[in-house]
Amino acid sequence: KQWLEIGMLLAQDPKLLLVDEPAAGMTATEREKTTAMLVNAAKTRAVVVVEHDMEFVRRLECKVTVLHEGAVLAEGRLDHVTANQDVLDVYLGR
């Protein structure tokens, strides 16, 4: 279902593609194909992915922005963001 929705969006040739949890409920193989599709789409347009699966995000190899209560908490490479103490405090409930 997600592929159909992403495909319908790409058919409209948008300058910005916003996808929410595109890998939800997918098998490992489907997640790999979705990663490739989004990486390819990002070559010709801006792609914003809202995702909680950090392994999926890691495979995208892109800049990550962590939001908390509507404000940017951290931004940068995934390894930088996941090592950020503010991010750890917020998401581990400290």
Task: For each feature predicted by the language model, list its residue ranges.
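Glycine-rich phosphate-binding loops of nucleotide-dependent enzymes
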Residues: 1-94
